[in-house]
């Protein structure tokens, strides 16, 4: 299963159910399949979800969906950041109960392919060699 890398601030909102739209600069073909939610910079697997649908986000969508994307930028600022912004509709979000880690490959920014989560004890054995 592939993993989507998300900054902690946004991931916390997604896992709490407050944020249901992930805003990205392009579409994705990974719709309808389970994915891992990976916390950027921590090598942690924090949850799973399905990307239910994807659509280019217009100015009116941006305003109407503010409660769902939770991003405090104007549409003009969004367009400065992303030339072609898309809303990824997240569904079936499930936080991971245990502490899971993953091996973060060099250069991975948006996706990590074929994530193999390991629990906290396995991580310690790997890091400390016991």
Task: Please describe what each predicted stretch is.
Residues 1-130:
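Structured alpha/beta reader/binder surfaces that contact nucleic acids or chromatin modification marks
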